[in-house]
């Protein structure tokens, strides 16, 4: 009880310090018996200008990632929203190290309106961990394993990438739908093994998701079949490796992840979503190359599982994607500068039902989304970052329709 009182007292001190010293980089408050309380986060804002071609007629996507015939300027967050996270860590007790994290992810912009009273605050993280010589258990809401590293190793993590909705109040998409599918933050129970010669294995059971589709039928009507009955958890796993070479001048990171989940329709029948993903990162001095990709069935094109994972008949759609990236980071008198170029693409296969509709009425379902990104990411110091990006995106549909969008963005981060 005394430790809890000290922790609450420390929290009160922290709030006071944070209110009067908002630019202090790292604040850690300690209590009695080894308890600690800390915070980390960022505030970011981007200015961006977008020009978009007309969206073709007679095409369908469950989630349109590009604007339609529009020139637009906005000020908004980048791929990362703002972050304000709180961390609590206990002293070691009986060989166990325990901690918890709660992360709030707000966005600075309204939904393209002057007045807004529901600006998005995304509670992405709320979990605790228990570490010991057996490895680690994580319980709560955190980034999912499947394709998690694909997203975290992309250079648009601290950039802008694809915008999604021009009038949106949330964060941008980065390379979501254009190199990987969004792994999302989900409720889970995860076990991670101790490191063994650079290798780790993580296995997790997740709160399952309904598996949803979207497509145009023979009558030209959009149908959205949904398998909503979930009787077992979703399972995800990741095998990863991290190591150094060339006397520490080089680093290597690789990963392989997988997903499996089933769901039933209320009127009978079931669907199965599965996928594999992986990648490798190789760095040497300031140079870094990343190649990652995924393949699966019933996953969707952009948002995983609950958007366009099925065609209009309820059949699982197959798809794959990849991201290729090269960066060079160098020190200069103004700080550290990273120059990068990347190409990412997601592609969906056409089901027999979708082809039949295309032959009959000409409708085209989503075929491919790809983007070329060129970026400059400059750290003035460890807490202040400047970013400039250019993204050239293209979407194709199976009936031959296509659309192109240019996105120019500049932004800044303050991080602690």
Predicted segments, located by residue:
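Residue-level detector of the transmembrane beta-barrel scaffold of outer-membrane proteins
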Residues: 36-42, 97-99, 136-140, 149, ...
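Outer membrane beta-barrel
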Residues: 27-49, 71-211, 241-244
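Detector for outer-membrane/organellar transmembrane beta-barrel domains
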Residues: 237-374
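Outer-membrane beta-barrel architecture
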Residues: 85-87, 126-129, 190-192, 238-240, ...
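Transmembrane beta-barrel strands of outer-membrane/channel proteins
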Residues: 41-49, 100-104, 141, 203-205, ...
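Outer-membrane beta-barrel "beta-signal"
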Residues: 196, 237, 378, 404-416
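Outer-membrane beta-barrel strand-turn architecture
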Residues: 31, 90-92, 131-134, 193-197, ...
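Outer-membrane beta-barrel translocator domains and adjoining extracellular loop/strand segments
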Residues: 52-63, 110-123, 152-155, 209-231, ...
């Amino acid at each position: 009880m005394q430790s809890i009182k000290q922790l609450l007292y420390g929290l009160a001190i922290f709030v006071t310090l944070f209110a009067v010293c908002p630019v202090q980089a790292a604040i850690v408050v300690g209590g009695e018996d080894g308890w600690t309380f800390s915070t980390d986060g960022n505030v970011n804002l981007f200015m961006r200008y977008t020009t978009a071609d007309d969206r073709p007629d007679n095409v369908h996507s469950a989630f349109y990632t590009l604007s339609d015939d529009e020139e637009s300027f906005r000020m908004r967050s980048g791929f990362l929203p703002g972050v304000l996270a709180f961390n609590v860590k206990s002293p070691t007790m009986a060989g166990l190290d325990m901690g918890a994290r709660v992360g709030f992810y707000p966005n600075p912009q309204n939904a393209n309106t002057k007045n807004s009273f529901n600006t998005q605050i995304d509670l992405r993280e709320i979990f605790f961990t228990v570490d010991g010589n057996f490895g680690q258990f994580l319980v709560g809401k955190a980034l999912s394993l499947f394709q998690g590293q694909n997203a975290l190793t992309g250079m648009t993590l601290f950039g802008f990438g694809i915008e999604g909705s021009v009038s949106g109040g949330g964060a941008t998409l980065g390379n979501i739908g254009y190199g990987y599918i969004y792994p999302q933050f989900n409720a889970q129970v995860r076990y991670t093994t101790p490191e063994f010669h650079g290798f780790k294995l993580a296995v997790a059971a997740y709160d399952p998701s309904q598996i949803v589709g979207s497509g145009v039928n023979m009558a030209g009507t959009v149908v959205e079949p949904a398998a909503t009955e979930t009787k077992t958890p979703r399972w995800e796993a990741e095998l990863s490796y991290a190591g150094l070479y060339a006397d520490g001048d080089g680093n290597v990171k690789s990963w392989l992840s997988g997903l499996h989940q089933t769901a039933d329709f209320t009127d009978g029948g079931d669907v199965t979503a599965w996928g594999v993903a992986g990648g490798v990162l190789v760095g040497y001095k300031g140079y870094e190359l990343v190649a990652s990709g995924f393949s699966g069935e019933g996953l969707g094109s952009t948002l995983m599982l609950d958007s366009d994972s099925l065609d209009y008949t309820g059949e699982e759609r197959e798809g794959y994607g990849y991201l290729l990236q090269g960066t060079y980071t160098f020190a200069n008198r103004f700080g550290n500068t990273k120059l990068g170029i990347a190409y990412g693409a997601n592609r969906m296969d056409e089901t027999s039902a979708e082809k039949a509709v295309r032959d009959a009425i000409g409708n085209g379902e989503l075929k491919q989304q790809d983007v070329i990104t060129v970026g400059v990411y400059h750290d003035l110091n460890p807490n202040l970052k400047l970013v400039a990006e250019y993204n050239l995106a293209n979407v194709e549909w199976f009936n031959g329709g296509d659309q192109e969008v240019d996105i120019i963005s500049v932004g800044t981060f303050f991080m602690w």
